[in-house]
Amino acid sequence: MSSRFLLQLLGFWLLLSQPCRTRVSEEWMDGFIRMCGREYARELIKICGASVGRLALSQEEPALLARQATEVVPSFINKDAEPFDTTLKCLPNLSEELKAVLSEAQASLPELQHAPVLSDSVVSLEGFKKTLHDRLGEAEDGSPPGLKYLQSDTHSRKKRESGGLMSQQCCHVGCSRRSIAKLYC
């Protein structure tokens, strides 16, 4: 029994001593390649597969990932905000009895007591339309907002064009695997 245990321990130790094939050395990532067509596509898959592409990006851009992780998300609950009384402000024709019932009901709901309100703004349809119009960007060119967003999709277009330039460069001149990983992975 003890010899079998030692044999299993030896096998386990040998497995642990083998280098992990998903990790990539610096020399391999900085290696200069010159490939075209299918070979380029296969190399792209090999570079971006498993953890290879993530390794190339993680070594050069840890601050970018940290900045994305610490992005501030606005909270809807603000303990210093005024009580939630927009119903009473928007409906001036309510009787005093209904206003009293509404204020008592709102006071009994703790989740409504800390909701922020727009105290100085006048809620009107025209103001809402103007705000919506400005936010969608129709004020500049008069075109519908959907068309504007389709026309302003320059980030993905630039990425596609730079990808084509990278494949041509790798075919004619050559490029490093790290530059491919930065562009595609």
Swiss-Prot record:
Keyword Plastid (UniProt) = no
Stored Pfam families: Insulin
CC per GO annotation: extracellular region
* GO molecular function annotation: hormone activity; signaling receptor binding
Propeptide at: 58-156
Question: Where in the cell is the protein located?
Answer: Secreted
Q: Which InterPro entries match?
A: Insulin-like, Insulin-like_sf, Relaxin, Repro_Hormone_Insulin-like
What the entry lists under SMART domains is as follows: IlGF
Between which residues do disulfide bridges form?
A: C36-C171, C48-C185, C170-C175
Q: Residues of the signal sequence?
A: 1-22
Q: Quaternary structure per UniProt?
A: Heterodimer of a B chain and an A chain linked by two disulfide bonds.
Family (UniProt): Belongs to the insulin family.
Purpose = Relaxin is an ovarian hormone that acts with estrogen to produce dilatation of the birth canal in many mammals.
Q: What is this protein called?
A: Prorelaxin 1
